[in-house]
């Protein structure tokens, strides 16, 4: 015979597992929510590797960045509102334009999107 407390514990464990599982959403890669996650990772990476970004900028002076990104890098508060409205193609250009995109940024962006329950799909 199964004790009622065992059943209650099992139900609670299942409920906790369901509550802990993030909801998933499939979005276009150009959706602003995707862009904000990407830019959040990008700003964090710049902060962590500032000297590397300065060297890259010095070697590629024609590569420009939206002023909102520079402001977000040096503003240690909530910067997400600063980054809204940057066009998706500009987000893609600045993020994929650095040599460490494939090795450092892309995996970090994928992880951050997955953690937020966001998956991207190319629109048909």
Curated annotation (Swiss-Prot):
Top-rank lineage group of the source organism: Eukaryota
One biological process term from GO is:
fungal-type cell wall organization
A GO-annotated cellular component: fungal-type vacuole
Any one GO molecular function term: structural constituent of cell wall
| Alphabetical UniProt keywords | Signal
Which Pfam family, just one, is annotated for this protein? Answer: SRP1_TIP1
Q: Which residues form the signal peptide?
A: 1-20
The family line of this record is:
Belongs to the SRP1/TIP1 family. Seripauperin subfamily.
Please give the name of this protein: Seripauperin-15
What species was this sequence derived from? Saccharomyces cerevisiae (strain ATCC 204508 / S288c) (Baker's yeast)
- What taxonomic ancestry is recorded? Eukaryota, Fungi, Dikarya, Ascomycota, Saccharomycotina
């Amino acid at each position: 015979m199964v004790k009622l407390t065992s059943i209650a514990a099992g139900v609670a464990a299942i409920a906790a597992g369901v509550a802990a599982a993030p909801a998933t959403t499939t979005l276009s890669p150009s959706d602003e929510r995707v862009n904000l996650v990407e830019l959040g990772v990008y700003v964090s990476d710049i902060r962590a590797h500032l000297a590397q970004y300065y060297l890259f900028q010095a070697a590629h002076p024609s590569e420009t960045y939206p002023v909102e990104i520079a402001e977000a890098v040096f503003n240690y508060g909530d910067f997400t509102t600063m980054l809204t409205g940057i066009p998706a193609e500009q987000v893609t250009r600045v993020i994929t334009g650095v040599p460490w995109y494939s090795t450092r940024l892309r995996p970090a962006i994928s992880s951050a999107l997955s953690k937020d329950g966001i998956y991207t799909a190319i629109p048909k």
